[in-house]
Amino acid sequence: MNNPLLSISNPVKFFKPPIPYRISLNTTINKKQKHQSKTLVVKSNKRSTTSLTSSVSLVRRRNNNGDGETTLVKKVGRDEKGQTVLLCALGYWVQGLRCFSWLALNFHMAHCLNLKPSTLQLVQYTASLPMVAKPLYGVLSDVLYIGGARRVPYISVGVLLQGLAWGSLAIFPGAREVLPSLMAFILLSNLGASITEVSQDALVAEYGLRYQINGLQSYALMASAVGGILGNLLGGYCLLKTPPRILFLAFTALLSLQLIVSLSSKEESVNLPRIGEVTPEISSVLGIVKKQFLDLKGIVQVDEISQPLIWIVSSIALVPLLSGSVFCYQTQVLNLDPSVIGMSKVIGQLMLLCLTVVYDRYWKKLPMRALIHIVQLLYAFSLLFDYILVKQINLAFGISNTAFVLCFSSVAEILAQFKILPFSVLLANMCPGGCEGSITSFLASTLCLSSVVSGFTGVGMANMIGITSKNYSNLPAGILIQSLAALVPLWFIHYVPMLEPGFEREGKRAMSKKSRRNRRVGRVIGQESFAYRRERET
């Protein structure tokens, strides 16, 4: 991209990762209830397994008088979990499959509408403008309920808008043959995709915080990568046999399946908290939205959040992309088949999937700044693969254009996508309760805005140096400028934190057994949180 606060009438407070950055939301909490809440005590006589399918979590809280305790038994059945997993996994999988329809759309604009490279790229990045408004969708998803829920209904609305857009492009010839109408339906499609992505990201972030599951964003990216692999593979092959409108229709059918799943899913199965009550000052919808924006503004201004955001946004916006020119060069000058372009994307998505798995298992324990430094260097040098292709240096080494495009064409794009993952995990772990949708959508919005700026800058640079559909002689110079611009963010790499907060806390908790006797010890297994306080031994 993409959380409600606990009910203030409920004296039970769930564990959530501590926010070490003094991020506070001006929520109205009953002081008496807050004063009575003291220590979370959970006892378990049996050794729990690490399975994520445990169905009961017992939480007890003892009051100050010590004469009573409040017990909450939280049941999450296997069927309910399966429904949640299906909803999220299918959503991210379809999100990755959007490349299936977009590959067909790019070939339709380049070959059927005969758009110039700069015009093609301008259409591509103008279509992303609805995604810039993701913070608005995130705030509405955080505070505005639809039918008693505030995540799943927004997913359904977004999927419906996408289905209407792609279905119209498939059925009505005038919708796809005239550029203004084509642009309108593309914008509608991306509006629906934005709403769906924000709701899914918020649902995943909130679910991970509530059940103490760290790094769920990695699995979301894996599902998206699997969808990208299948979408590019089928898209490249189908374009050789069928016109683009058939691919639009097939993707519409897939969206219909996702809509059925989302409509049949109940948000109560996720067992997420609700916003209990609001103060009279914010009782109106506009008041709630205004308060949420103020909370978001206060959170984003914290250095520990603003500095990583500034770096990742700058690292994208400072690079003038020439993706439209390179695409037209590959298809119009090198005459590469759609299957070759699609297969190159498949290989790239396989690389992204492997990188995500390795990151989730090993690399997320590495210093974040060092990891991002290496990835940015690799990204800057991988942009030179297009330079090698345009200058035909690969032929001097006996590598055909087809083989070179298959192996190296998508490396830079995949590294740019992978670079975002550590920042997504970082901000998801730092989200205060009730702002998951706002924070994740703000991240997605800034990333999208930086991509739009990068694309528009690339169009301007292409026009300045004279890159046209009939003259690609200056394309190598533009690619060199791209690569040099990608090195600029390394000058302020210190904005990236050394470690993610979760691993900093784990390092601080690594202490001797003697020290742990007098400290609170916590461990998380699966979805059950155990915490107890030992008295000082005398």
From Swiss-Prot:
Keywords: Chloroplast, Membrane, Plastid, Transit peptide, Transmembrane, Transmembrane helix, Transport
InterPro entries found in the cross-reference section: BT1 (IPR039309), FBT (IPR004324), MFS_trans_sf (IPR036259)
Membrane topology, record value: Multi-pass membrane protein
Record's GO cellular component terms: chloroplast membrane
Transmembrane spans: 85-105, 129-149, 152-172, 178-198, 220-240, 246-266, 309-329, 339-359, 370-390, 395-415, 447-467, 479-499
Gene3D superfamilies in the record: MFS general substrate transporter like domains (1.20.1250.20)
Signal peptide annotation: none
SUPFAM superfamilies: MFS general substrate transporter
Annotated transit peptide: 1-57
Domain of life: Eukaryota
Record flagged with keyword Cytoplasm: no
Subcellular location: Plastid, Chloroplast membrane
Function field: Could mediate folate transport.
Family listed: Belongs to the major facilitator superfamily. Folate-biopterin transporter (TC 2.A.71) family.
Protein name: Probable folate-biopterin transporter 9, chloroplastic
Organism lineage: Eukaryota, Viridiplantae, Streptophyta, Embryophyta, Tracheophyta
